[in-house]
Amino acid sequence: MYMLNNMLNDVPTPWGMFFQDSATPNMEGMMELHNNVMFYLCMMLGFVSYMLYNMLTTYNHSVLPYKYLYHGQFIEIVWTTFPAMILLIIAFPSFILLYICDEVIAPAMTIKAMGLQWYWKYEYSDFIDDKGETIEFESYMIPEDLLEEGQLRQLDVDSPIVCPVDTHMRFIVTAADVIHDFAMPSLGIKIDAVPGRLNQTSALIQREGVYYGQCSELCGVMHSSMPIKIEAVSLGEFLAWIDEQ
């Protein structure tokens, strides 16, 4: 009897050509939409390729076989209605997913992320420390010469975000200087951090793990030095971490 263990891909990989493994319902919906759209695109590509091949071979062996045919009403209707139907089939699930991802459903906690050149600042506005102030901290990328065994180059930080699983969370994202972007591929999050503006998104992490993201908006010479690290833990471990702050 063989035991098969899943190896989850929650970090960027060299020459990666596909999505990271999903950890939220939103990301699962995005991957399903991508697969459905690719199915229709492959069908259209195959059909158009067949038609082009058929036309080339037909006209190659015949000398103007349809020289008196100026138009075909039926085929004109087909090539107009068929693409329109395909676009509608693609559009409806896309719009539904778009509105679902934009909806913030009764968040149990809020995390504020502020982008600065070139680090992140986080605030847990629902929790206070011993001084009666909200819990906040800055997160910097660990330099390559200080990395420990098992840490990832240009992805690990000194102070990661810690959050509980199976909890509706709201991320409020802004910036203090230039435009940044808070992106977490495994969570299906990518939202601009704009100075003077508060953007929000939500996440429901369904499994424990460590997730990595990066600033996805060119923000200066040290743009690549703004990684994001989220540690998703159980509720008990999260409350213990809060008590230590």
Swiss-Prot record:
<dbReference type="InterPro" id="IPR002429">
    <property type="entry name" value="CcO_II-like_C"/>
</dbReference>
<keyword id="KW-0679">Respiratory chain</keyword>
<comment type="function">
    <text>Component of the cytochrome c oxidase, the last enzyme in the mitochondrial electron transport chain which drives oxidative phosphorylation. The respiratory chain contains 3 multisubunit complexes succinate dehydrogenase (complex II, CII), ubiquinol-cytochrome c oxidoreductase (cytochrome b-c1 complex, complex III, CIII) and cytochrome c oxidase (complex IV, CIV), that cooperate to transfer electrons derived from NADH and succinate to molecular oxygen, creating an electrochemical gradient over the inner membrane that drives transmembrane transport and the ATP synthase.</text>
</comment>
<dbReference type="GO" id="GO:0042773">
    <property type="term" value="P:ATP synthesis coupled electron transport"/>
</dbReference>
<keyword id="KW-1278">Translocase</keyword>
<feature type="binding site">
    <location>
        <position position="226"/>
    </location>
    <ligand>
        <name>Cu cation A1</name>
    </ligand>
</feature>
<comment type="subunit">
    <text>Component of the cytochrome c oxidase (complex IV, CIV), a multisubunit enzyme composed of a catalytic core of 3 subunits and several supernumerary subunits. The complex exists as a monomer or a dimer and forms supercomplexes (SCs) in the inner mitochondrial membrane with ubiquinol-cytochrome c oxidoreductase (cytochrome b-c1 complex, complex III, CIII).</text>
</comment>
<keyword id="KW-0460">Magnesium</keyword>
<comment type="similarity">
    <text>Belongs to the cytochrome c oxidase subunit 2 family.</text>
</comment>
<keyword id="KW-0496">Mitochondrion</keyword>
<keyword id="KW-0472">Membrane</keyword>
<dbReference type="Pfam" id="PF02790">
    <property type="entry name" value="COX2_TM"/>
</dbReference>
<dbReference type="InterPro" id="IPR011759">
    <property type="entry name" value="Cyt_c_oxidase_su2_TM_dom"/>
</dbReference>
<feature type="topological domain" description="Mitochondrial intermembrane">
    <location>
        <begin position="1"/>
        <end position="36"/>
    </location>
</feature>
<feature type="topological domain" description="Mitochondrial intermembrane">
    <location>
        <begin position="102"/>
        <end position="245"/>
    </location>
</feature>
<feature type="binding site">
    <location>
        <position position="217"/>
    </location>
    <ligand>
        <name>Mg(2+)</name>
    </ligand>
</feature>
<feature type="binding site">
    <location>
        <position position="219"/>
    </location>
    <ligand>
        <name>Cu cation A1</name>
    </ligand>
</feature>
<keyword id="KW-0479">Metal-binding</keyword>
<dbReference type="InterPro" id="IPR045187">
    <property type="entry name" value="CcO_II"/>
</dbReference>
<dbReference type="GO" id="GO:0005743">
    <property type="term" value="C:mitochondrial inner membrane"/>
</dbReference>
<dbReference type="GO" id="GO:0004129">
    <property type="term" value="F:cytochrome-c oxidase activity"/>
</dbReference>
<feature type="topological domain" description="Mitochondrial matrix">
    <location>
        <begin position="57"/>
        <end position="76"/>
    </location>
</feature>
<dbReference type="Pfam" id="PF00116">
    <property type="entry name" value="COX2"/>
</dbReference>
<keyword id="KW-0813">Transport</keyword>
<keyword id="KW-0999">Mitochondrion inner membrane</keyword>
<keyword id="KW-0186">Copper</keyword>
<keyword id="KW-1133">Transmembrane helix</keyword>
<feature type="binding site">
    <location>
        <position position="223"/>
    </location>
    <ligand>
        <name>Cu cation A2</name>
    </ligand>
</feature>
<dbReference type="InterPro" id="IPR036257">
    <property type="entry name" value="Cyt_c_oxidase_su2_TM_sf"/>
</dbReference>
<dbReference type="InterPro" id="IPR001505">
    <property type="entry name" value="Copper_CuA"/>
</dbReference>
<feature type="transmembrane region" description="Helical">
    <location>
        <begin position="37"/>
        <end position="56"/>
    </location>
</feature>
<feature type="binding site">
    <location>
        <position position="215"/>
    </location>
    <ligand>
        <name>Cu cation A1</name>
    </ligand>
</feature>
<feature type="binding site">
    <location>
        <position position="215"/>
    </location>
    <ligand>
        <name>Cu cation A2</name>
    </ligand>
</feature>
<dbReference type="GO" id="GO:0005507">
    <property type="term" value="F:copper ion binding"/>
</dbReference>
<feature type="transmembrane region" description="Helical">
    <location>
        <begin position="77"/>
        <end position="101"/>
    </location>
</feature>
<keyword id="KW-0812">Transmembrane</keyword>
<keyword id="KW-0249">Electron transport</keyword>
<feature type="binding site">
    <location>
        <position position="217"/>
    </location>
    <ligand>
        <name>Cu cation A2</name>
    </ligand>
</feature>
<feature type="binding site">
    <location>
        <position position="219"/>
    </location>
    <ligand>
        <name>Cu cation A2</name>
    </ligand>
</feature>
<protein>
    <recommendedName>
        <fullName>Cytochrome c oxidase subunit 2</fullName>
        <ecNumber>7.1.1.9</ecNumber>
    </recommendedName>
</protein>
<feature type="binding site">
    <location>
        <position position="180"/>
    </location>
    <ligand>
        <name>Cu cation A1</name>
    </ligand>
</feature>
<dbReference type="InterPro" id="IPR008972">
    <property type="entry name" value="Cupredoxin"/>
</dbReference>
